[in-house]
Amino acid sequence: MILSGLWRLTLLICLSAMLTACQPEKKSIAEWPHSAVGTLDAAISRDGRFALVSSVNFGAGYWDLEKNQLKFQWTHNDNPEDGIIAVNISPDGSRAITADKRTFIIWNTNSGKAYGYWEAPADIRAVAIANKGRYVLLGLGSGKAIHIDMNTGRRLEFTGHRNEAVASVDLSANGVWAFTGGNDYRAVLWNTKTGKPRHLFEHDTRVTQVKLGISGKKAFTSGTLGNATIWDIQSGAEISRLSLRPREYVISAASFSEDGGQLLTGAPGKDISLWDVSSGERLFRWTARTRKEGKPGGAIIYAVGFSEDGRHVLSESSAGYGEKWSLADARTN
């Protein structure tokens, strides 16, 4: 979920309730400090090897998680007011995108070099990038979503969110399908070649998170009151609803497993949960660390992902820490 910087930190913490685990608490097997002050947004590569972490006042760091090594430090300018509030890594891992309130930059993740600097027509709320950086999708505060062909410069404006802010976006690896969720209580899957919707998913609240499955067969949406649903993209039918308690308001991050059988989510209350896609039942829950251990504190989970070998879960939180968890915890529960 990508909203506006510090405002997002305050909003999500206020909306969330502190979650308590049903199972005995399992600690992470690795912990990495990625931000000294706090994190504004984060993304984890599909193979689980890298993380892109936007820090308060320090730009965005591209981290090698296997070595716990900062590979690149990227900034837009020297003005701390222009913080990087939205980030994403392409599915193939070759490109990354960072955005401040009105501009975005595409980066080569091998060399660290920038391809260019572009301006958006309105405030940026969310970003996504396709393989090799060929296509970019922007969710704007104006209610529009813009799909850009970075090779030809073609721009397609999608106006299907009734002038309400587009809070979350996702893009298929080939850039053909866009998935957008907005404050108009809608999530829309639409074709970027024609601009025509394929499926419209209505919600009872603002849509705060959308995510496409890796195989292109499933999708996930959630709102501000725990109405989290997994969908069949082919038919548009509901597969399952996550078994959330009424006070579990917001899901701030989501990622499907490679085979599409499991869903990983993150929430503002330090919560990382593993779900069964078919039933919507929670399989396990982990609790992320906070900045001040032993004292009351929260942590919004901004990114979650699976390791390439399928043995571990990865997370990045607003507390500035990346963590690694064992999936064996869920199997032995």
Role assignments for model-derived ranges:
Residues 2-7, 16-333:
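WD40-repeat beta-propeller superdomains and closely related acidic/aromatic-rich repeat-like regions
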